[in-house]
């Protein structure tokens, strides 16, 4: 397969991944459930994880559910039954991706909507099916629920330019959506929207944070901080190996054969996602590096944007 075909294939994969969740709405979804993690923090959800924090003065709901699931309305009804007289005070969005924030408008009668400042523009432009946030922040924000503080913070562009982390220090819980999965696992199906180097730094920071015993990912079971280190180690190794092959003049077809990452094959989702991770890492590195033109021209051998079979080598300036 040529480089340009691989690029198109990876973009098609991204569309397939996104549309797959639309199709998921038409099949039987996992049942909604609530799990108490600490005295004040709960995980809820079905296909995706949300969370909520209960204080004396109100409840903060972090993330919605997949569109069409009616999951947030289900949660609102459950909260009324379990915590009568305690209003929803805030709704937080981990990032702008719709499958994690659908339905939060059901809390708009009492709750104020929060997101990172960068998320608001995406939500408006893409017409996300959620309430547009009225409160935005840049680096850090603390909300008080009455005896319980919830800290929302931004580590820079990582998975999207607006992904935030949510920390409840007194409960030693960190909500880290779409940045890790349970145990030792790949975190993402592919890396197309990843800011790679800052993600590596952020993963290291999250792996060392104090006052964290429980990590709530965006999908699957709860985990620990070690999962951040697993993901960081994989990304560091994948970047180094793909770059090494590119510097040696290898195209994506050869890289897919040589960069097998077999030493990470015990990671969850490895066999399903490794090919797309390699392809999208190559895409990131293609734009990251500036090849030395002499004795060859990597971009001449592996151009982007030209029809397959009609590319002539040239000696650029």
How does the language model describe each region?
Residues 36, 59-60, 66-67, 118-162, 169-170, 200-203, ...:
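Metallo-beta-lactamase
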Residues 252-317:
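C-terminal regulatory/interaction regions
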Residues 22-26:
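Boundary at the C-terminal end of the N-terminal hydrophobic targeting segment
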Residues 8-19:
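Bacterial N-terminal signal peptides
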Residues 33-77, 165-177:
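Conserved beta-strand hairpin/beta-sheet module of binuclear metal-dependent hydrolase folds
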Residues 40, 53, 63, 79, ...:
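Divalent metal-coordination and catalytic microenvironments
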Residues 77-144:
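Active-site HxH/HxHxD metal-binding segment of metal-dependent hydrolases
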């Amino acid at each position: 397969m040529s480089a340009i075909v691989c690029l198109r294939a990876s973009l098609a994969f991204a569309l397939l991944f996104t549309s797959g969740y639309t199709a998921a709405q038409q099949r039987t979804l996992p049942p909604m459930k609530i799990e108490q993690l600490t005295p004040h923090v709960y995980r809820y959800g079905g296909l995706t994880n949300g969370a909520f924090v209960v204080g004396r003065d109100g409840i903060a709901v972090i993330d919605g559910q997949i569109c069409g699931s009616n999951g947030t309305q289900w949660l609102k009804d459950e909260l009324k039954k379990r915590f009568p007289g305690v209003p929803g005070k805030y709704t937080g969005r981990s990032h702008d991706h719709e499958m994690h924030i659908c339905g939060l408008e059901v809390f708009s009668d009492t709750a104020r909507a929060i997101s990172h400042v960068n998320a608001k523009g995406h939500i408006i432009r893409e017409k996300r099916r959620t309430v547009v946030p009225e409160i935005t922040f840049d680096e850090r924000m603390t909300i008080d629920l009455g005896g319980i503080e919830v800290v929302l913070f931004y580590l820079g562009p990582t998975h999207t330019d607006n992904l935030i982390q949510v920390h409840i220090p007194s409960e030693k819980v960190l909500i880290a959506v779409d940045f890790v999965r349970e145990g030792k696992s790949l975190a993402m199906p592919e890396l197309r929207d990843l800011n790679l180097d800052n993600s590596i730094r952020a993963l290291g920071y999250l792996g060392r944070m104090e006052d964290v015993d429980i990590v709530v990912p965006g999908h699957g079971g709860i985990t620990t901080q070690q999962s951040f280190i697993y993901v960081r180690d994989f990304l560091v190794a994948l970047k180094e190996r793909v770059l090494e092959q590119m510097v040696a003049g290898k195209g994506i077809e050869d890289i897919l054969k040589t960069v097998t990452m077999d030493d990470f094959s015990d990671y969850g989702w490895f066999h399903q996602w490794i090919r797309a991770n390699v392809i999208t890492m190559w895409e990131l590195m293609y734009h990251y590096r500036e090849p030395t033109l002499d004795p060859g021209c990597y971009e001449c051998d592996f151009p982007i944007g030209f029809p397959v079979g009609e590319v002539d080598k040239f000696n650029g300036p």
